[in-house]
C-alpha cells in the first residue's frame, strides 16, 4: 500500500504481488488503483473491478549499493507507516503491544533484509551484453511439492521436466541444470531431471545470459513465474507454454516469444527449430527486450498505474 498526494488530490495504491489472481477485497475497497502482477480479466472482469490494472511479472532488484543506506531508508519508511497505523487504528492496547514487540525485533528485521539485499542485483545487471551461445542451454528451476489441490506434478513440474529431457537428449547441445527439489517434492517420476547443484544468483544470471534460449511455463497456482519478467528484461529467446493470466499487453508468438503446447513433442520441435534458425532466435531476443522496455520496467509500471513524475 502507498499513498501519493498532489496538492489536495490524494490517490491510494495497492500492489498485489501474490501468485493468485483472486482480488483481496478489503485492499481493493481501500485503494483507488489496484495493480496486480497476476491479473486475470476472465475471472476478475474489468466490469466488476474497474480499479484493476495489469502489471508485468516482477522480480527483486537491489535498489541501493550500500546495505546500511538501504536498511535506514526502509526503517524510516516503516517507522512512518507504523506510527500512522497505531495512531489511526482501532486495535486494543494489548494487540498494539504485541505488534510493536514484533516490529522491535531488529535482528530479525536486518537479517531478512540483508539476505534479500545480498542475493539480488541492481537493475543494470539485466542490461545483457553477453551474446547467447549457439549450443549451450542452462535451465535451473524448482521442483514444487504436489498435492491434491495444486497438482503440480501434472502441470508445472511435468512441463519443466519435458523441457529438461528434450534439452538433454539433443546431440551437440551442452545442457546444464535441472530441477531442484526437497523432501516434500521428491518424486521418482522426475529422478532423471533432478539436480542438487545450486547456483548463486549471480551465477544463475550469467549462465542464463549465455543460454541459447530459456523456458517459461505458468508456475505455482498457474501464476506468472518471476523468471518470465527476468527473461524479458534480459532479452532472451523464450520458449513458453500458454500463459494462464493476463499481461499489460499480450506477448506475440514469433515476435517476442515462442509458444508451444504442453507436451514433450511440441517443446522438442521448438527447441530444434530455434537451434537451426539463429536469426529467428535473435529476433525473439530483440522482441523480448523491446516488450520489457515498453511494459515491464519500473517506469513502465508507474505509467500503467498512471503515476507521473
Predicted ranges, named:
Residues 189-193, 204-308:
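Catalytic binding pocket for nucleotide-activated donors in carbohydrate/polymer assembly enzymes
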Residues 1-222, 243-249:
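Nucleotide-sugar donor-binding catalytic core of glycosyltransferases
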Amino acid at each position: 500500500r502507498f499513498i501519493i498526494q498532489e496538492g489536495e488530490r490524494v490517490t491510494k495504491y495497492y500492489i498485489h504481488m501474490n501468485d493468485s489472481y483472486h482480488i483481496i477485497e478489503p485492499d481493493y475497497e481501500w485503494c483507488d488503483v489496484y495493480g496486480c502482477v497476476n491479473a486475470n480479466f476472465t475471472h476478475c472482469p474489468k466490469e466488476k473491478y474497474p480499479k484493476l490494472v495489469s502489471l508485468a511479472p516482477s522480480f527483486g532488484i537491489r535498489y541501493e549499493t550500500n546495505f546500511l543506506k538501504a536498511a535506514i531508508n526502509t526503517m524510516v519508511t516503516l517507522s512512518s507507516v507504523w506510527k500512522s497505523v497505531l495512531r489511526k487504528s482501532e486495535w486494543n492496547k494489548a494487540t498494539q503491544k504485541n505488534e510493536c514487540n514484533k516490529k522491535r525485533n531488529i535482528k530479525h528485521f536486518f537479517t531478512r533484509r540483508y539476505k534479500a539485499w545480498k542475493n539480488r542485483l541492481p537493475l543494470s545487471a539485466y542490461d545483457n551484453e553477453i551474446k547467447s551461445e549457439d549450443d549451450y542451454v542452462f535451465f535451473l528451476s524448482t521442483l514444487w511439492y504436489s498435492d491434491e489441490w495444486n497438482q503440480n506434478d501434472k502441470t508445472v513440474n511435468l512441463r519443466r521436466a519435458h523441457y529438461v529431457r528434450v534439452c538433454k537428449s539433443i546431440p551437440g547441445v551442452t545442457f546444464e541444470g535441472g530441477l531442484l527439489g526437497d523432501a516434500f517434492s521428491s518424486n521418482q517420476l522426475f529422478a532423471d531431471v533432478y539436480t542438487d547443484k545450486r547456483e548463486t544468483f549471480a551465477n544463475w544470471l550469467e549462465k542464463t545470459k549465455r543460454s541459447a534460449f530459456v523456458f517459461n511455463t505458468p508456475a505455482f497456482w498457474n501464476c506468472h513465474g518471476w523468471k518470465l519478467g527476468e527473461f524479458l528484461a534480459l532479452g532472451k529467446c523464450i520458449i513458453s507454454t500458454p500463459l494462464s493470466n493476463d499481461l499489460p499487453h499480450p506477448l506475440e508468438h514469433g515476435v517476442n516469444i515462442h509458444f508451444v503446447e504442453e507436451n514433450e513433442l511440441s517443446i522438442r520441435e521448438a527447441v530444434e527449430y530455434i537451434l537451426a534458425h539463429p536469426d529467428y532466435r535473435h529476433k525473439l531476443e530483440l522482441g523480448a527486450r523491446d516488450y520489457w522496455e515498453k511494459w515491464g520496467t519500473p517506469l513502465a509500471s508507474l505509467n500503467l498505474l498512471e503515476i507521473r513524475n
